[in-house]
UniProtKB/Swiss-Prot annotation:
The lineage of its organism: Eukaryota, Metazoa, Chordata, Craniata, Vertebrata. PANTHER family: TRANSMEMBRANE PROTEIN 256. InterPro entries: DUF423. Belongs to the TMEM256 family. One of its GO terms (cellular component) is mitochondrion. The gene is TMEM256. The chain crosses the membrane at residues 64-84, 93-113. It comes from Homo sapiens. This is Transmembrane protein 256.
Length: 113
């Protein structure tokens, strides 16, 4: 397993470690502006974990570069918009979430190829 496939496996592992770090921060250190912020943070974290696992499967599909790029960029856009809004209370970048979600959907479909 070499090239982009191995890189996405490593990225999935690093992303999973980051998701665990965010989960710990959300549970023990974060100060949320309101209850909705905590809900958004938990939603982002759940998706962060799930799509980190999906990245680990990228080396086993026929189009690892496509699947990996779609999943990685989708996870970044989707989760970042929710993490940011949850911690700051500022919804200004929430418009990135639908774009990220679309990329995630396409990434899952690319895994099926």
């Amino acid at each position: 397993m070499a090239g982009p496939a191995a890189a996405f496996r490593r990225l999935g592992a690093l992303s999973g470690a980051a998701a665990l770090g965010f989960a710990s921060y959300g549970a023990h250190g974060a100060q949320f502006p309101d209850a909705y912020g905590k809900e958004l943070f938990d939603k982002a974290n759940k998706h962060h974990f799930l799509h980190s696992l999906a990245l680990l499967g990228v080396p086993h599909c026929r189009k690892p570069l496509w699947a990996g790029l779609l999943l990685a960029s989708g996870t970044t856009l989707f989760c970042t918009s929710f993490y940011y809004q949850a911690l700051s209370g500022d919804p200004s970048i929430q418009t990135l979430a639908p774009a990220g979600g679309t990329l995630l959907l396409l990434g899952w479909l690319a895994l099926a190829l």
